[in-house]
């Protein structure tokens, strides 16, 4: 009962598994994994398929579990990393290319992250020249966030990087393009 409560399934404990939604089945799998209080818990994309409220609950559960056990989280969801991890490793082609703290991966992109307002008429050329980490369309122009290690142009505005910027910076450092 206690484990079902942790994963918010106590009210559904009498349902057959086939009657559970995809997110509920995922939470049931986590309940099975923590049932015998393992010293190491390995979870793969644990919040995929969960609604936003359950995603937050589950991130908090992982953070609490990590207080007295090792939790290995495999995910592509940056929000999961930001909410639950102190240390992380980045794999590329089966090799560890980074092992450190979340602050260290963010720091790796510091000084290389810019916001630039690009006229729509120039966006295609801009995409070919720079690593764009995000963009937002404002009609006549597109506000882009880029990684760039060369001398910045006058319209480039330096901004603080995120974990995602640090991750992309690592990938381009090891054999990427546009730098």
Regions from the language model: what does each represent?
Residues 130-179:
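C-terminal coupling/interaction segments
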Residues 5, 67, 111-114, 172, ...:
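Residue-level marker of structural boundaries
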Residues 58-145:
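ABC transporter nucleotide-binding domain
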Residues 4, 59, 106, 164-168:
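Conserved protein kinase catalytic domain
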Residues 1-73, 78-92:
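ABC transporter nucleotide-binding domains
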């Amino acid at each position: 009962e206690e484990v079902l409560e942790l994963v918010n399934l106590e009210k559904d404990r009498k349902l057959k598994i086939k009657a559970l939604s995809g997110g509920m089945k995922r939470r049931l799998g986590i309940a099975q994994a923590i049932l015998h209080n393992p010293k190491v818990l390995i979870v793969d994309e644990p919040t995929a398929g969960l609604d936003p409220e359950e995603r937050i609950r589950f991130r908090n559960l992982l953070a609490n579990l990590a207080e007295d056990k090792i939790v290995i989280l495999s995910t592509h969801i940056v929000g999961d990393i930001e909410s639950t991890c102190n240390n992380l490793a980045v794999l590329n082609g089966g090799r560890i290319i980074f092992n450190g703290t979340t602050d260290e991966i963010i720091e790796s992109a510091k000084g290389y992250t810019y916001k630039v307002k690009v006229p729509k008429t120039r966006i295609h050329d801009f995409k070919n020249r720079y690593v764009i980490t995000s963009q937002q369309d404002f009609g006549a122009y597109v506000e882009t966030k880029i990684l760039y290690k060369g001398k910045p142009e006058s319209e480039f505005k330096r901004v603080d990087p995120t974990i995602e910027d640090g991750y992309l910076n690592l990938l381009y450092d090891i054999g990427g393009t546009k730098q």
